[in-house]
Amino acid sequence: MSRLQRTATVSLVVLAVLLLGAAKYPARGAGHAPPAKPATCQRSAFRAVVDVGHTVEVPGAISARGVAEYAFNLQLADAVKQALVAAGFDRTVRLVTATAPPKGLIERAALANKMHADLFISIHHDSVPDYLLETWQYEEQQYQFSDRFQGYAVFISHDNADRAGSLQFGRLLGKALQARGLQYTPHYTLPLMGNRRRELIDAAAGVYRYNQLIVLRNTRMPACCSRPDRSSTGRRSWNWRARNAASSSARPSCPRSRIFAWRG
């Protein structure tokens, strides 16, 4: 992931957090301001939790060039946290656990609840089902990739305690991505996804409903799973495949059917 790619994604997340924070914690006197003047946010009072998907021991999928998904999740989560702190959100926490799923997922949601967080963002990168993958050679090693789909996705759970807030933030993030010329991936709606099909609840923002995501379902604050992608195709795409055959059943919040992420 290049610095430019990371910066673009981080800026969009920060923008969405700012917008949500302004709605949740308007500055003193903002309620008496003229209607045309946007509310500002008490950033020091707003706590965002940036959740790193997967663990060192269960690193998720493998990219088209042999890099574990966890490495990308950690890199992006670090950048998001740093940018939020730099923007004045001093209470931002990057959440990492070593416990294997599903117990680790439950622990992460419980930690966010204990912190009384205002927002929960889970960072993941995606791939397609295994049967859609092709093989190619990179640096004398064989890896798998897929050119079939591209785009980002935002997941929310209707079982989250703040369903309306989750949808609000998901829409803010998705629309910010679209404003930068990115498109959401439609492949989650297709029959080829089988039992991994998801309901598209906001086509304008690329927001999908996935009620079973543990870290979204068990948190008590607005929560979404951000699955960023760059609009690229070909073997330069960072396309993911699942490492474990049982991952879809053992890790309901980390499905095997993912898209793809960063190109090299």
Named regions from a protein language model:
Residues S2-G264:
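Catalytic-site microenvironment of enzymes
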